[in-house]
Amino acid sequence: MKVFVLLTLAVLLMVSADMAFAGFGCPGNQLKCNNHCKSISCRAGYCDAATLWLRCTCTDCNGKK
């Protein structure tokens, strides 16, 4: 039961994060990722270490929850 609850929480946390799933410069060009996120009304973007810097993750996106 504990494993199920932990897995459910992990999935909910992943779904609730504002992420752009395509590369958008990652890996190697974090500035391109940041510019992409700003272009879609997010505050900033970075190449996510949890995905070995392959995914651009946007933060503080307006109107997306």
Curated annotation (Swiss-Prot):
InterPro entries: Defensin_invertebrate/fungal, Scorpion_toxin-like_sf. It is found in: Secreted; Target cell membrane. It comes from the Eukaryota. Induction: Constitutively expressed. Beta-D-GlcNAc-(1->4)-Mur2Ac(oyl-L-Ala-gamma-D-Glu-L-Lys-D-Ala-D-Ala)-di-trans,octa-cis-undecaprenyl diphosphate binds at residues 24-26, 36, 56. Keywords: Antibiotic, Antimicrobial, Defensin, Disulfide bond, Immunity, Innate immunity, Lipid-binding, Membrane, Secreted, Signal, Target cell membrane, Target membrane. GO terms for biological process: defense response to bacterium; innate immune response. Disulfide bonds join 26-47, 33-56, 37-58, 42-61. Coiled coil: none annotated. Has the structural arrangement of an alpha-helix connected to a beta-sheet by disulfide bonds (CSalpha/beta). Belongs to the invertebrate defensin family. This is Defensin Cg-Defm. The lineage of its organism: Eukaryota, Metazoa, Spiralia, Lophotrochozoa, Mollusca.
